[in-house]
Amino acid sequence: MTKILYGNEVALKIKEDLNLRMDKLKEKNIIPKLAILRMGNKQDDIAYERSIIKSCEKLNIETKVEELNEDILEEDFLKLMENLNNEKDIHGILVFRPYPKHLNENIINSSIALNKDVDCMHPLNLERIFEGDLDGVMPCTPEAVIEILKYYDIDLKGKNIVIINRSMVVGKPLSMMVLSNNATVTICHSKTIDLPSITKKADIVVTAIGKAKLIKEEYFNENSIIIDVSINVDENGKLCGDVDFENVKEKVGAITPVPKGVGSVTTTLLLKHIVEAAERNS
């Protein structure tokens, strides 16, 4: 019988710890605060922003939103970032991606103060992960994948893991993180030939393609553990993942649902990183 790996349970456990840590910060009159930088008015970004603000409010974390024009000059962006870096009451900074094409991603990411980077965007924080150091801040989505596997006692040691994503947001950092946990990793992407033949041999498949219900039962074996990172909208306007959940849910070992899967843990880990930043700077 297929086990459903609910992210909500993982998120709840993390929040229990965060509530205790927030109480200790309150005793010191410290209120964690997140600055959100959004360029343009994409509906997905606005929806994500609302979700973050709502989650922060529940934990009494303050937020400051900087709504920027999509054509903002790089020098103006960097001036704003410098101001936010110097604001003592701001503990975390999150910049929504992808960036407008005229902005240099490396320059933007490097402008975030290391101690206020809550999603491992700064190259130096990413470098630590590629060196096998997982003690610092980690990117929220890859960390959510790891936390779900840990919560459900899925040991990564010796496992064959296929990651269908090669971005610096998910695929590449996650590959380094599972390597540090002694797994064997294969990264696949849009140019991979005969993807089902590769995923079917894997113990764990992590997918972050961004294509609604693209992946069917022929991609898996009866013991496959599936972590579906993507949040898509299907033909009926309902949220779904890359995997056709109804098609595979009785034919694999375990699977995360969408919604109530990776996304809820990702947001909770962002809150955790904000609290940790406030603790460090207190």
Curated annotation (Swiss-Prot):
GO: which molecular function terms? methenyltetrahydrofolate cyclohydrolase activity; methylenetetrahydrofolate dehydrogenase (NADP+) activity
The protein's annotated catalytic reaction(s) are: (6R)-5,10-methylene-5,6,7,8-tetrahydrofolate + NADP(+) = (6R)-5,10-methenyltetrahydrofolate + NADPH; (6R)-5,10-methenyltetrahydrofolate + H2O = (6R)-10-formyltetrahydrofolate + H(+)
Q: Which UniProt keywords apply?
A: Amino-acid biosynthesis, Histidine biosynthesis, Hydrolase, Methionine biosynthesis, Multifunctional enzyme, NADP, One-carbon metabolism, Oxidoreductase, Purine biosynthesis
Keyword Amino-acid biosynthesis listed: yes
The organism's place on the tree of life at top rank: Bacteria
> Looking at the UniProt record for this protein, which Gene Ontology cellular component terms does it annotate, in alphabetical order?
cytosol
GO terms in the biological process aspect are: L-histidine biosynthetic process; methionine biosynthetic process; purine nucleotide biosynthetic process; tetrahydrofolate interconversion
Task: Kindly indicate whether the keyword Endoplasmic reticulum belongs to this entry.
Answer: no
Q: Which InterPro entries match?
A: Aminoacid_DH-like_N_sf, NAD(P)-bd_dom_sf, THF_DH/CycHdrlase, THF_DH/CycHdrlase_cat_dom, THF_DH/CycHdrlase_NAD-bd_dom
Q: Where does NADP(+) bind?
A: 165-167, 190, 231
What Enzyme Commission number does this protein have? Answer: 1.5.1.5, 3.5.4.9
Pathway recorded for this protein: One-carbon metabolism; tetrahydrofolate interconversion
Q: Which family does it belong to?
A: Belongs to the tetrahydrofolate dehydrogenase/cyclohydrolase family.
What subunit structure does UniProt give?
A: Homodimer.
Entry function? Catalyzes the oxidation of 5,10-methylenetetrahydrofolate to 5,10-methenyltetrahydrofolate and then the hydrolysis of 5,10-methenyltetrahydrofolate to 10-formyltetrahydrofolate.
Q: What is this protein called?
A: Bifunctional protein FolD
Record gene name: folD
